[in-house]
Amino acid sequence: MSSGSRVRGPNSALTEFLRSQGINASALGRARPPRQSEESAGQSTGTESEVIQTPTSVEENNEDENSMSTTTIEIPVVKRRNLRNQKKKKKTDEEAEDNEDTFSMNSRAGFSYKAREHTGKLDFCAHCNCRFTITPYSKYSNSEKGWLCYPCSRGAEDRSVPELRTRKRKALTRKKVAAATMDEEISVPKLQDLCIRVIAEYINDIEAFGDIGQVNMDKISQIISKNRSLNDTTVKLFLSGGQTELKLYDCSKITADSLFQIAQYCPNLQTLHLTYCGQMQDQVLHFYADHLTELTDVSFQGAFLVSSSEWINFFKKRGSKLISLELTDTARIHVSVINAIVDCCPNLISLNLSRIFYLDDECVRLLAGCRNLVSLKIESPGGIINDGSILDVLNQIGSGLHTLSLSGCTKLTDEVLKQGIGPCCGRLKHLNLSGLELLTDDEASIVFGEWKIQSGLETLSLRRCLSLGDKTVRAVLVNSGHTLRTLDLNGMSFVTDEALQYIVNFPLPMLKALDVSWIRGMNDKLVCDFESKKPTLEKLLVWGDNHVLMPSNRLLLIGREVQ
């Protein structure tokens, strides 16, 4: 074959023929990727260049030889150069074929093996009824039971994208509805509430807000505390000179320096509620005792760094004006602190001691000296509290109590009901007995049935009183059914569907919230009965009731498994 001719030999013709039949001839004889071919080509080129340089050097070193010998040496050089060009061209063609194969392997996303069997056949599109040739990339429509032409198959892909977006949008909507249900926000929010949410969203631009007004401050504080956005910068929004009430619901990111600023900027505070104020130290509380002289309502939740001596100092300075006091989540409050509360806070009306590590019978007995108490909450104490200490307190101040919470006092028995609450607490409106697992159904039903209460209970929590059952539920309804607004029966596994049906049929004109979670007898039929027969009922909690599946049209139904 002439070196100047570009006509391919038999191999190229065979390659073209095999390529027309869809067969890659280069892949049959070579089992290495294109990169290896390039490396081998580079090596062969270097070898040939060395071979070609040999006759040239011979010609330069032997200039005295005749021209025939020189011509004999130069002819192979020309042939080898042509051969080298042909090899380069052949390898370039083969590399191009390999690149095309590689590209085709990466672009087979729409390839169909089902269409491969019918490739080349003529058919009519199942969608537009036009005639077309089936290719390996043609799509088969299961809904229309036929092959689709190229335009119709592209349209089917375009239609699938909005369907996917619609499904994602529906899933997101379901999540938002579930979150709103948990937050008890099922109605259309007011414009004022929407504005407050916008302010909370851009709370970091605090300097651009100006004067918002004290009325909406509490709502904004709740929202940004829920978002964990309350910090040293955003807390300044709530501090002003003429402010008399301040409630911060998450102070975990507020340092001691910012806690100092509360007393500096708001010296006229009368109500101060600080939740999760774990960074409060002795110096901060001492500063409050000296500068916040008008305090009457105080709540410190989680101030575990404040020492007992500083608590005593605070109550000595500010206790005479205190009307409401709440202390929770601390291990620094001992008997001496409780004694200071009793001695230095004679006007105390409301007292809440929750999750106090060293609260025991000795501390509780001292509370009998708070003669003016109307609300008493002793919840989840760290020490052991028995019936005797609670009975001593109730015998002294029980007649004046409107609110009593003994939640988490797990060692209390029926004696508290029979000798304390029943005979001594005739003015109670709010009673919380959550977690009192030693109460029995027979004794509790007798106490509630014979309880001579003046106006009836408005809220009652029997959550996790595991031994109570149908008798207690009936006695409670007979005693206070006409005044009950909130009833919590969460976890009372001995309550049957008969007792639930009794609640449905019993007249409860004031009932707004009912918790029947983890009661096996609760089902969809009872939900419908509550919805139709209890017009005042607004919220129904059904956590763990796996027979409640259907949604409610009117009630705020919280806790469905499919929610």
UniProtKB/Swiss-Prot annotation:
Keyword DNA repair: yes
Localisation: Nucleus
Example GO BP: nucleotide-excision repair
InterPro entries, A to Z: Leu-rich_rpt_Cys-con_subtyp, LRR_dom_sf, Znf_Tbcl_Rhp7
Region: Disordered, residue numbers: 1-101
UniProt keyword annotations, A-Z: DNA damage, DNA repair, Nucleus
Biased composition (Polar residues): 39-59
Compositionally biased region (Basic residues): 78-90
GO CC terms, sorted: cytoplasm; mitotic spindle pole body; nucleotide-excision repair complex; nucleus
Keyword DNA repair recorded: yes
Family the UniProt entry places it in: Belongs to the RAD7 family.
Protein name: DNA repair protein rhp7
